[in-house]
From Swiss-Prot:
Residues 20-43 are annotated as: Disordered. This is Globin-like protein 9. GO terms for biological process: oxygen transport; response to hypoxia. It comes from the Eukaryota. One of its GO terms (molecular function) is metal ion binding. Keywords: Heme, Iron, Metal-binding, Oxygen transport, Transport. Residues 52-205 form the Globin domain. It holds the Pfam family Globin. It comes from Caenorhabditis elegans. Belongs to the globin family. Heme binds at H116, H148. The gene is glb-9. InterPro entries: Globin, Globin-like_OT, Globin-like_sf, Globin/Proto, Mb-like_M.
Length: 249
């Protein structure tokens, strides 16, 4: 995702959260008037993984999360609200979900912002437990990403939304006083968020490709069936025309 000037780690495809020494938080956005950028692909040989985190950085993540967790709801709410401003698509999705939820009091609607905030907190609880198991770690994140692929068709949810989420989360979390207390915690959270966003996007895009492939295959099969039905109808018509031309005996 990013290349960190303050860290030796290089991340995956997304490069939307490049860290520099400019600005109070060491974070510069590139590509637009505010410095935001779209992602660019990098080769897998340059990718950072969760295994690149040192033991002390993993400790720093867990310790800082315990301190941050009581304030997590407020932090994540700010992130999602900023994402709504940055992406009208997200605002529309949350609005529709809240509207549906107003008429459905049986179960929590997982698409609302409030439930997203709760689930994000729970997600980080589970994620930090799996820091030593990269397969489980990646699968958890990609599963979340793939679950959002269904929004691509009806709500125009796109990969650039993950990019923007990464930019906002990087700025909000990494500038939090709990995280900025130690250099190890700051570097670790930047690494974690960069990999997190990349895997979310990877899961989303992978599932989206499967949807498109399935849809394309279904269209081909449907086309074949329609062609066969049309051919059958034409053959029936030919038989009827032929029978009508036969002389009566």
């Amino acid at each position: 995702m990013d290349e960190l000037s303050t860290s030796p780690y290089q991340f995956r495809r997304t490069q939307s959260c490049r860290v520099t020494n400019k600005g109070p938080n060491g974070l510069a956005r590139r590509g637009t008037q505010r410095g935001c950028s779209r992602s660019k692909s990098t080769r897998r040989g340059n990718l950072g993984t969760i295994a690149s985190l040192t033991f002390s950085q993993k400790q720093a993540l867990n310790l800082s999360w315990r301190l941050l967790k009581p304030q997590a709801s407020a932090c994540f709410r700010k992130i999602f609200l900023e994402l709504e401003i940055a992406s009208p698509k997200v605002k529309q999705i949350f609005y529709k979900a809240a509207l549906v939820d107003a008429f459905n009091k049986d179960d929590d609607n997982s698409a609302t912002m409030e439930v997203h905030i709760k689930l994000t907190t729970k997600f980080f609880d589970e994620l930090l437990v799996s820091l030593d198991d990269e397969t489980e770690f990646v699968n958890k994140i990609r599963g979340i990403g793939s679950a959002h692929a269904i929004l691509a068709k009806g709500s125009n949810f796109s990969s650039d939304i993950w990019e923007r989420l990464g930019e906002i989360a990087m700025e909000r979390v990494c500038s939090h006083e709990v995280v900025t207390k130690t250099r190890e915690a700051s570097r670790a959270w930047r690494t974690l968020i960069a990999i997190l966003i990349d895997e979310l996007r990877g899961g989303f895009e992978g599932e989206l490709r499967q949807h498109r492939k399935s849809s394309s295959t279904d269209q081909i099969e449907m086309g074949k069936m329609e062609d066969e039905e049309e051919l059958h109808a034409k053959l029936q018509q030919l038989r009827m025309d032929y029978n009508q031309t036969l002389p009566y005996t």
